From Swiss-Prot, chain B:
Subunit structure: F-type ATPases have 2 components, F(1) - the catalytic core - and F(0) - the membrane proton channel. F(1) has five subunits: alpha(3), beta(3), gamma(1), delta(1), epsilon(1). F(0) has four main subunits: a(1), b(1), b'(1) and c(10-14). The alpha and beta chains form an alternating ring which encloses part of the gamma chain. F(1) is attached to F(0) by a central stalk formed by the gamma and epsilon chains, while a peripheral stalk is formed by the delta, b and b' chains.
Family: Belongs to the ATPase C chain family.
Record's function text: F(1)F(0) ATP synthase produces ATP from ADP in the presence of a proton or sodium gradient. F-type ATPases consist of two structural domains, F(1) containing the extramembraneous catalytic core and F(0) containing the membrane proton channel, linked together by a central stalk and a peripheral stalk. During catalysis, ATP synthesis in the catalytic domain of F(1) is coupled via a rotary mechanism of the central stalk subunits to proton translocation.
UniProt membrane topology term: Multi-pass membrane protein
Protein name listed in UniProt: ATP synthase subunit c
Amino acid sequence: MANWKYQTTWAGILTSWILLGALLVFISLGTKKMENDPKGLQNLLEFLWDYIRDLARTQIGEKVYRDWMPFIGTLFLFVFVSNWGGALIPWGLIKLPSGELGAPTADINTTIALALLVSLSYFYAGLSNKGWRYFEYYVHPTPIMLPFKILEDFTKPLSLSFRLFGNILADELVVGVLVFLVPLILPIPVMFLGLFTSAIQALIFATLAAYYIGEAVEEHH
Amino acid sequence: MDSITSAASVVAAGLAVGLGAIGPGLGQGNAAQGAVEGIARQPEAEGKIRGTLLLSFAFMESLTIYGLVVALVLLFANPFS
């Protein structure tokens, strides 16, 4: 562990702020003139809203899903926009003095921050909904489960962050290697595959976050 | 980095991805088999089956990706160098 230094990653912060700004503009444009018969952008946003609501409702349950829908939706949209923004916007054209711009989620700091947010929120969801009875979950079927359940609290953010980080980085690396070997045409299908997997990873991140929150608020009988 | 550490790191990086790909490969094969059987039995449920299949594929794939992360750490951010 000799030369692991703390490094600030301005490139990741910069791209995530740019993408967040784009997302904000996109959503405020879509909700500016709301009509009864949605069309165009408003239609798309309503479709997204429905999608996120269904996701939250199936994972968290009818009773409390409304409290957590904004969080799940934010996670989904942020991860989705980061993944696609990193792949679709030609960041390579912008030269930086140090580091390079790319998908914010290809940076381990971003994904660990998101995963820790998920951890905090499922603890908060459990404690605020059930009080101290939340800790019954740790000894739920039998007290033998206690060490495993405690270990799970550490592996959840670990797997959540590494899954997202690894997938996005792997996409970028595969495209990079292919562009290095065959610069023409051949990388294009792989790029589409990358877009597809990044969309699925955003969905998985949001689904798992919702599932963990749902697990914490679930009533045992 | 001395040569024995770098050699061991490269071998370990290869093994991490290679061995990590075995389990998820078998798992994805099983899942695809189940999905094909399901579609053959009930062609009208194809859309639902495909969605679930892709979601579970991504879960299995992430196991190999963990191996890839370990391999990348060994190659580019080796803690023992």
